[in-house]
Amino acid sequence: MADKKIKIRQIGSPIRRPKDQRKILTGLGLGKMHREVELVDTPEVRGMIRKLPHMVEVID
């Protein structure tokens, strides 16, 4: 059984953001503008995305 995936794209710059927001971006595997990453859809990943609605968008 395959795990459900979620695809996200970074739309906000980490420059002049609080350190905790930059760490969350790094934890999601992002760091540069317009990069996309595909992650396993878990409650932990969803929570990280919910903390950064102004910096990431869900594609899939």
UniProtKB/Swiss-Prot annotation:
Assigned GO CC terms: cytosolic large ribosomal subunit
Pfam families noted in UniProt: Ribosomal_L30
InterPro entries: Ribo_uL30_ferredoxin-like_sf (IPR036919), Ribosomal_uL30_bac-type (IPR005996), Ribosomal_uL30_ferredoxin-like (IPR016082)
GO molecular function: structural constituent of ribosome
Presence of keyword Ribonucleoprotein: yes
Any one of the GO BP annotations: translation
Stretch forming the signal peptide: none
Keyword vocabulary terms for this entry: Ribonucleoprotein, Ribosomal protein
Family per record: Belongs to the universal ribosomal protein uL30 family.
Subunit and interaction comment: Part of the 50S ribosomal subunit.
Name used for this protein in its record: Large ribosomal subunit protein uL30
Lineage: Bacteria, Pseudomonadati, Pseudomonadota, Alphaproteobacteria, Sphingomonadales
